Amino acid sequence: MLPFPPGAILRDVLNVFFVALVLVRFVIDRKKTYFPLVFTIFSWSAVILWVIALTIFSPDKIQAIMGGRSYILFPAVFIALVILKVSYPQSLNIEKIVCYIIFLMFMVATISIIDVLMNGEFIKLLGYDEHYAGEQLNLINSYDGMVRATGGFSDALNFGYMLTLGVLLCMECFSQGYKRLLMLIISFVLFIAICMSLTRGAILVAALIYALYIISNRKMLFCGITLFVIIIPVLAISTNIFDNYTEILIGRFTDSSQASRGSTQGRIDMAINSLNFLSEHPSGIGLGTQGSGNMLSVKDNRLNTDNYFFWIALETGIIGLIINIIYLASQFYSSTLLNRIYGSHCSNMHYRLYFLFGSIYFISAALSSAPSSSTFSIYYWTVLALIPFLKLTNRRCTR
């Protein structure tokens, strides 16, 4: 069985058709657009050419193709969505799409919480198979004997970082005056699921999101404290599992447990090993060697990193890392430019939003390989593409 299930194949095929159709229509109609977006498209083209070159010279073509798709396909949804909204304004209903994303994350977060309370049996009752991609695929779904929230997304790390995007969307909707109580309740559910994923970076980012929005909104502070006082005691009384999670979370952030100390030291050792390897082999190991594509290889070439920047360098070399960083940074800059043109923010409020976007990506990339997964990457670039056009009130200022 290939470590590439039918659902993933269908997702990638649909992704290719979506991006290709948008670009073809854009070229045929000869639509004009902003220079940063044009630069982004050229940067993306450079990534494609580099991946093609690496694939041609790779001894394992299938492995290289599996590795290359995360660089070409997942972030490209940003380009397609921005082109649609800028060149064909009526083609997308941003409010409905954002509400759908929030609702979807609320549903999977609820499922993940119930699953944790049922000790990992709930998603199995829903038909989830943790070996959907073969026995060789090792999933991160437990820690120190405790089930980690995954929501059926296979990996607790990717799941936790994905939900931080939901928290950010909820807080942005709240700041724009859109269904404030509902958004706050949903964000709390998402935060509980993030905590149950036991993903330190995601918990840190979610706390940072709340802190920055609360600082600029007293209503949010009052509502948040009220909900916290009501919800947390009810959950704590209903089950003692929260006591175990609280103890583990404290251990995760203080390194007071043996497992946590091993995790922290392991990351340091992996970073040193990656730097040593790249200093001797700046061209890296090869495309597809760090992800699931490595399972197709006779020889295990993976060098564990838990860092997406090292991941890119090990797969595409130092040059590939530079090209990818330029491409990803160009998309981020394009979003900030579009926010200044189309956004609902005034003053310096958009800096808060993009600081949080940058924090989500940097922390997830520095502490994991989450940006290489479709679970996190597609949602991240989708939200980054849509957020400049999100106007939920007639006010031009975020308060």
Swiss-Prot record:
What is the designated name of this protein? O-antigen polymerase
**One Gene Ontology CC term in the entry:** plasma membrane
Any idea of its EC number?
2.4.99.27
Its job: Polymerase involved in the biosynthesis of the lipopolysaccharide (LPS). Catalyzes the polymerization of the O-antigen repeat units on the periplasmic face of the inner membrane, leading to the formation of the lipid-linked O-antigen molecule.
Show the stretches that span the lipid bilayer.
Answer: 4-24, 37-57, 64-84, 97-117, 151-171, 185-205, 222-242, 309-329, 353-373, 374-394
According to UniProt, the reaction catalysed is:
n lipid-linked O-antigen repeat units = a lipid-linked O antigen + (n-1) polyisoprenyl diphosphate
| UniProt keyword terms in alphabetical order | Cell inner membrane, Cell membrane, Lipopolysaccharide biosynthesis, Membrane, Transferase, Transmembrane, Transmembrane helix
User: What is the topology of this protein in the membrane according to its UniProt annotation?
Assistant: Multi-pass membrane protein
Q: In which pathway does it act?
A: Bacterial outer membrane biogenesis; LPS O-antigen biosynthesis
Cell compartment(s), UniProt:
Cell inner membrane
Domain of life of the native organism: Bacteria
Task: Please provide, alphabetically and separated by semicolons, the GO molecular function terms listed in this UniProt record.
Answer: transferase activity
Q: Name one Pfam family in it.
A: Wzy_C
Report the gene name.
Answer: rfc
- List the GO biological process terms: lipopolysaccharide biosynthetic process
